[in-house]
Amino acid sequence: ASTAQLVNAETRCLEPALLKELGLTEDNFGRFVYPGDKVGVLTKEIQTITGLGAIPVIAVAGHDTASAVAAVPALDRNFAYLSSGTWSLMGVETDAPVINEETEALNFTNEGGVAGTIRLLKNICGMWLLERCRCDWEEISYPELIAEAEACEPFRSLINPDDVLFVNPMSMEQAIRTYCADHHQPIPETRGQIVRCIFESLSLRYRQVLENLCSLSPRPVEVLHVIGGGSRNDLLNQWTANAVGIPVVAGPSEATAIGNVMIQALTAGAASDVVSMRQLINRSIPLKTFTPENVEVWNTAYLHFLQLA
């Protein structure tokens, strides 16, 4: 409901003014269901198919990212998260919405989280750039692409990953080359150069968004937790740490599924609260920590990136 933007983030109720503009009333909507609410039991049909019996059905977080954020293995609240996949979503958890001219100007959103929290976040382009390039290439593995990228010259070409040019081009590879030509940069010629351009540009974009996020957050950000499928990309994680200048903790990669399970565990009494739930995930899931390296080099590259973005 909060993602649909019909809910007043402060009152946590449907916004009457918006409903009036749309010719709707609260009677047009069902009751709000919150993460952890028991909504019933399995239907007879599903019981027969699965053999599970009349087990309870528990509402998890509102969608995949919300459940993934529930699985962030943080040991305190001074963290930001990056849900990394086709798209990247970066944010912090807050107790109350942050609504002001700055959040509007920077295009941050306030969405519902678990245990009454708000997810103050921004959507960023992610591995979409590489996935679309791979459509144009012969079958090649991620390890091969990463090795080719590592062997290329650093910061030869950079792009703004959120430029409209990359929304849905006929050829992502050609779109990247066009962007570089239009911005008077060397044009990537090889796969490795394109992949390096994508990863370096994403890392620097993450820094830009994180700096904006820190200016909005009610608490300091001391670590960036990368969750989702992109957390398996060690090279991107290391470059992200280099760019943002704080430790990056990667994992779990299956954060959405783990978050779903843990919300059900909370309802079942197997975990006492979100803090203990996250501590359990931290102890149970292999995590990797990446500390910043070559910070001055990345600071210089960031200044160049800002001229593009």
Region annotations inferred by a language model:
Residues 2-6, 27-35, 226:
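A glycine-/small-polar-enriched, mobile loop at the entrance of the PLP active site in fold-type I
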Residues 9-11, 35-39:
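Short beta-strand to alpha-helix junction loop
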Residues 229:
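Glycine-rich Rossmann-fold phosphate-binding loop(s) that bind the pyrophosphate
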